[in-house]
Regions:
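Short acidic-aromatic active-site loops that bind/stabilize oxyanions
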Residues: 83-87, 125-126, 236-244
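Short, well-structured secondary-structure segments
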Residues: 79-86, 103-120, 124, 144-152
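Charged helix-capping and loop-helix junction motifs
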Residues: 125, 129-132, 189-195
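Conserved residues at the C-terminal ends of beta-strands
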Residues: 15, 109, 179
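Catalytic pocket-lining loop regions of alpha/beta-barrel enzymes
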Residues: 140-148, 153, 157-159, 163-332
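Short glycine/proline-rich turn/loop motifs
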Residues: 69-85, 114-119, 228-235
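Active-site metal-binding loops of divalent metal-dependent hydrolases
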Residues: 11-12, 336-337
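Mid-to-C-terminal alpha-helical segments outside catalytic/metal-binding sites
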Residues: 2-5, 16-85, 89-105, 134-142, ...
């Protein structure tokens, strides 16, 4: 791996307890989520985020980096703010822990913010996004060549979402989240999103669809504000939502109309992609009655994938074996620091294992070059 610097396309911060109270507009301050300390029935203390009296996530659910290598049985998603690694909220400490992992730079995404997409109050969700976007922009200013922030958009109101997207670009953010699945009555095939697609294309801002960011109220979706509703089946099949949304965009002709738009899957891993591409191409060719769109350029759905989409993953060795079908240029690796699934601090070992026998050029693209180009890291990262 000599000769280039590894970049994590998917790392996270952990939002400080006072982020929203300090950053949100005054009219929303009384309703801002807060961290409260409670005890379990056995007397163990833990911190959790609360919104209007309802628990909407524990601090411990996003701070378990490294435990899988020490004692995976101890991962119970309980914890105190004092347990959070300083690197998760302080940029210089972040750089130190990335270096410990053999990583030079990182694209930083929210942690608790993933849960906010499930809020029913759209106006408040937008305010939380604005508060976070300002904070993460300031965080990355400590090392703008090595830390790239990803903002959050609420796209319930497309015009409002486009305004915030423009602000994110002005703040220097490298991309933005949109819900992996929007409100149930307005999937991404709707023309109402065309201004969003145009704005993202015009600003060269990638749109990222992260696991567990479905909007609230979607029938059959177990990612709700009540974490107890999530079952093993719901988690293991979470890639359904990303497949549906990306397929809806392709078959609505979004990438015909916006050929430079870039949209990506985050943390759904990647081995599902080949079968999905095959199914889309089959449907396009063999089931024309199920589609109302015909490619302007005679392209198959799989060809739009290769031109307009990307996938971020952590340790999908099956995906590496299938890289020629998925597309080496479409794959980006991330260490998911500081979450329980993170490969930190053993990312180098994981990369050596999953890339065993893989050409060095492919490994470099997936672990460095693709992220550098997509998120505009400095030439120093080459």
């Amino acid at each position: 791996m000599s000769g280039y610097r590894v970049i994590s396309a998917d790392s996270h911060i952990v939002e400080p307890p006072d982020l929203y109270e300090n950053r949100i507009e005054p009219k929303f301050r009384d309703r801002a989520p807060r961290i409260e300390r409670h005890r379990t029935r056995t007397g163990r203390e833990y911190d959790a985020w609360y919104f209007e009296g309802v628990r909407v996530g524990t601090v411990g659910s996003v701070i378990q980096a490294g435990k899988r290598f020490e004692d995976p049985g101890s991962i119970d998603f309980l914890g105190l703010w004092e347990d959070v690694r300083k690197a998760a909220y302080e940029p210089h400490a972040m750089l130190e822990e990335l270096e410990m992992d053999g990583v030079w730079g990182a694209c930083l995404q929210p942690s608790q913010g993933l849960f906010w997409y499930r809020l029913s109050n759209s106006e408040l969700l937008s305010a939380l996004c604005r508060a976070y976007n300002g904070w993460i922009a300031d965080f990355c200013q400590a090392a703008p060549d090595r830390l790239k922030g990803v903002g959050m958009l609420n796209v319930d109101d497309v015009d409002e979402g486009c305004q915030e997207l423009e602000r994110c670009a002005d703040l220097g953010l490298a991309g933005v989240f949109i819900p992996v699945y929007p409100l149930p009555d307005r999937p991404y095939r709707h023309a109402m999103y065309d201004r969003l697609w145009w704005t993202a294309q015009d600003l060269a801002m990638p749109l990222l669809l992260h696991v567990a960011t479905t909007r609230g109220g979607i029938p059959g979706c177990e990612f709700t504000l009540d974490f107890n509703q999530l079952t093993a089946a719901g988690l293991a099949n979470s890639d359904y939502w990303i497949r549906y949304s990306l397929t809806a965009m392709i078959f609505a002709g979004v990438f015909d109309r916006f050929p430079r738009l870039l949209v990506g899957s985050v943390e759904h891993e990647t081995a599902w992609v080949p079968h999905w591409l095959k199914q889309m191409d089959f449907t396009y060719r063999e089931r024309p009655t199920l589609r109302s769109w015909k490619s302007r350029d005679g392209m198959l759905p799989s060809e739009y994938w290769r031109r307009n989409m990307f996938v971020e993953f952590m340790e999908d060795d099956y995906g590496i074996r299938l890289r020629d079908i998925i597309g080496v240029d479409n794959m980006l690796w991330g260490n998911d620091f500081p979450h329980a699934e993170s490969t930190w601090p053993k990312s180098r070992e994981f990369l050596d294992r999953i890339f065993a026998g893989t050409p060095d050029e492919d490994r470099r693209k997936i672990t460095s070059d693709n992220a550098r180009k997509l998120f505009r890291f400095s030439k120093e990262s080459e």
